[in-house]
Amino acid sequence: SMVRMMENALDWEHLPYVHASSFSAISCISQGKWGWRAKASQPAHGEEDQVLELLLDLDRNYWATCVVSGPGQGIEIHTQANSLSGSEIEIDVRFYSSTEIPQDQVGIYVDVLTQQYALLYDEDVALMSGRQSALDDREQWAREKSDSSEILVGDSQRLAKSERTIVETPTGRFCVRKLNGTWIAHSATCSHLLGPLDDTTVNADGSISCPWHGYRFNIETGENLDGKCRALDTPPRVREAQGKLYLSFEA
């Protein structure tokens, strides 16, 4: 939707995580409803950092991204988005340069920029679709009430062979793992912007990281280790009995 697209344009923080082949790090210089300016690093070793600026006209669904300094300085990418229907959006992308480009290199610039923008857009579509799906799930979970105080997950020996097991419940999605010999459960949804935590691996420090923005959480307590957002939703308790694993929602 257009709402997700405008939300994505303002979200500078996702660049090194969703677009890891194009960016390795980013730090915000300033931001607001007008857009943002940030310093971004590239994966290529030895490449100079870029200062990027995105200016957004929310009323017109229009934004322009400019390379203020660093590789590609002076390049501008202007995007106009138009709604065709509730689920279809047409975008018009145009490339400009505030510095003169030799005529024999114009085609190369256009090809490189077109390929990179197509990749970035495809990666963003996955994020925007995932975000909308997560919002729909949250709305449904808010309406639901669990009729059971306990849910059977499955055979504990079989589950132990898997790195993780995702359990859908009427009130949320949870990930069940065996950590250091103990069964635990944690929310499979990031508390920041609802990023997916169902396919994450456990880091060496016992944390898990959101693939959208890199926010880290203690897998056992749910605490956000970056101090940037609230803790993960409280998970149900894991109970093992007679070779079976259960999620218990009893207090």
Residue ranges and their predicted role:
Residues 1-154, 158:
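C-terminal catalytic domain of Rieske-type non-heme iron oxygenases
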